[in-house]
Amino acid sequence: MSLQSIKYQRGSLEILDQLLLPVVSKYLPVRGVEDGWKVINKMQVRGAPAIAIVGCLSLAVEIYPEEFSSKKSLRQEIEGKLNYLVSARPTAVNMKISADELITLANELTKDDAITVEEMKQRFLKATEAMLEKDIADNRAIGANGAKAILEHVAEATGVATAGPVRVLTHCNTGSLATAGYGTALGVVRNLSELGKLEHVYCTETRPYNQGARLTAYELVHEKLPATLVLDSMVAALLRVKNVAAVVVGADRVAANGDTANKIGTYQIAVVAKHHGVPFYVAAPLTSIDLEIPSGDHIIIEVRPDREMTHVGEHRIAAPGINCWNPAFDVTPASLITGIITEHGVFKPEALKVEITKLLEL
């Protein structure tokens, strides 16, 4: 059974504190927007889909008991606080897209004279709550599409009708802890396992925050999947000797040309995969694709505190006084990406903008 990172019922929200994993499993109450901003910014919840869901649900929890004198005041509350939540971690686009969609809904309901202020509030609550179910459904579709693409690639490359079990590599954490459930890149791994086609999964430690060692390894052990943890610096050696069939990672933001911002270290894995002829896939829902930016050059890269590099917990591991550069993300050029796995199919980076535009017009 997948782990549950988000617990929600109307008026109540709790998140699994990911800073304490894998040693302690503790849920934190999120009582409103300030709590939501803090748990996102401090990375007690992380993963682009989960950030958006927790951010929006934190507002739903806050406005649930409130009474509003007018639709205008409710709209102002929604718009102001959603924009504030976007600032918690700006690289991940899902929160921004979700905020824009909910603000658009609020504006439309404000203009509709047939809708009362209470009806407007209920519509908003239902819209935020629907994000949970949709994310899980989207993740399952991503998992199925990604597994199919990897197995088809292996079958074609080896000249067989049906591929046998495969070995894959993943980076950072893209599973139930990063989403509403099931996961994106880790959803692909789960689907391979469900099909009986997963021989082994390798996960990187993902320095400096160790999401792979702390979170992905935790999920894989929890589900008893055949898995091995490797250091970030071992990837080239791994791809050379372990017959890895594919690399599959998540995304915090995908530009219109397919350039992808993901956890720091993703870019170098893509370079190494290209050298070894290993297909490199990005698994991301449509909410992680930002057609408004033409390339990765326009993606804002969050820089995290030095302490995340110099300390593990309370223990210093770097020399006092050393300067640090700690970007949380890097951008993998589209030229290194084999395919972008979405809930609607797998797209070549060069075809992404056209295909996604078609889907959005439906």
Swiss-Prot record:
The keyword Nucleus is annotated on this UniProt entry: yes
Subcellular location: Cytoplasm; Nucleus
Enzyme Commission number, as recorded: 5.3.1.23
Catalytic activity: 5-(methylsulfanyl)-alpha-D-ribose 1-phosphate = 5-(methylsulfanyl)-D-ribulose 1-phosphate
Catalytic machinery residues: 252
Cysteine pairs bridged by disulfides in the record: none
Keywords associated with the record: Amino-acid biosynthesis, Cytoplasm, Isomerase, Methionine biosynthesis, Nucleus
Gene Ontology biological-process entries: L-methionine salvage from methylthioadenosine
Pathway: Amino-acid biosynthesis; L-methionine biosynthesis via salvage pathway; L-methionine from S-methyl-5-thio-alpha-D-ribose 1-phosphate: step 1/6
GO molecular function (one): S-methyl-5-thioribose-1-phosphate isomerase activity
Marked site positions, Transition state stabilizer: 172
Electron transport is among the record's keywords: no
InterPro entries: IF-2B-related, IF-M1Pi, IF_2B-like_C, Initiation_fac_2B_a/b/d, M1Pi_N, NagB/RpiA_transferase-like
UniProt cross-references to SUPFAM superfamilies, sorted A to Z: NagB/RpiA/CoA transferase-like (SSF100950)
Gene Ontology terms: cellular component: cytoplasm; nucleus
Entry's family note: Belongs to the eIF-2B alpha/beta/delta subunits family. MtnA subfamily.
Biological role stated in the UniProt entry: Catalyzes the interconversion of methylthioribose-1-phosphate (MTR-1-P) into methylthioribulose-1-phosphate (MTRu-1-P).
PANTHER family: METHYLTHIORIBOSE-1-PHOSPHATE ISOMERASE
Protein name (Swiss-Prot/TrEMBL): Methylthioribose-1-phosphate isomerase
